UniProtKB/Swiss-Prot annotation:
It comes from the Archaea. It comes from Aeropyrum pernix (strain ATCC 700893 / DSM 11879 / JCM 9820 / NBRC 100138 / K1). Coiled coil: none annotated. Belongs to the DNA glycosylase MPG family. The lineage of its organism: Archaea, Thermoproteota, Thermoprotei, Desulfurococcales, Desulfurococcaceae. This is Putative 3-methyladenine DNA glycosylase. The keyword Hydrolase applies. GO terms for molecular function: alkylbase DNA N-glycosylase activity; DNA binding. Transmembrane segments: none annotated.
Length: 194
């Protein structure tokens, strides 16, 4: 495995971080046994100006996390399943990246397959117990690493975000084109290469 992504990696706009997380290695030791997978799909969410952002829903725990320290896990429940986000934003802003799907590496198969954000969390044993974990620190239950074995020059595609009723007019869902471990979500506008 390559080097651990530094804290500074997450101190950038969420869309930049989401795109650059593709191909990186997510390690979850949340259940005690460590599992590794390659990030294949991610969505960017901004602050209160983003109609799909949780930052618009009051000033509770999630709002504080979105404005909080970049590089920390943000785990919350939706539709009876856990979702894993990584806080990412420029200084003084808010934002996070929702990890939607990943390709299992070790073990080579996970049940359920980690395709879609709820299934990713379930397959990697992610729940509120890892909320706030620093993904840039060794020994954390969740970490993100460089991937020296990533396919050189894989194509990144992008589209609108999945399952949002009101969206920004930007393609904020990024994924590895042609990878079988990407959700088959219907979104508009149509996917394009980014």
């Amino acid at each position: 495995m390559g080097r651990l992504l530094p804290k500074s990696f997450y101190y950038r706009q969420p869309d930049v971080v989401a795109r650059e997380l593709l191909g990186k290695i997510l390690v979850s030791c949340a259940s005690g046994a460590c599992m590794r997978c390659m990030v294949t799909e991610a969505e960017a969410y901004f602050g209160e100006c983003d109609p799909a952002s949780r930052a618009r829903r009051g000033r509770g725990r999630i709002w504080r996390a979105l404005y909080g320290e970049p590089g920390r896990a943000l785990v919350y429940g939706m539709h009876r399943q856990w979702l894993l986000n990584i806080v990412a934003h420029s200084e003084g802003m808010a934002g996070a990246v929702l990890l939607r799907s990943c390709q299992p590496l070790e073990p080579p198969r996970l049940d359920p397959p980690p395709i879609g954000p709820g299934r990713l969390a379930r397959a990697l044993s992610i729940d509120r117990g890892v909320d706030g974990a620093p993904v840039y620190e060794r020994g954390s239950p969740l970490t993100l690493w460089e991937n020296p074995e990533a396919v050189e020059g894989f194509r990144v595609a992008c589209s609108g975000r999945v399952g949002v009723s009101e969206d920004l007019e930007l393609p904020l869902r990024f994924y590895i084109a042609g990878n079988p471990f990407v959700s088959k979500a219907r979104v508009s506008p149509a996917p394009k290469h980014c």
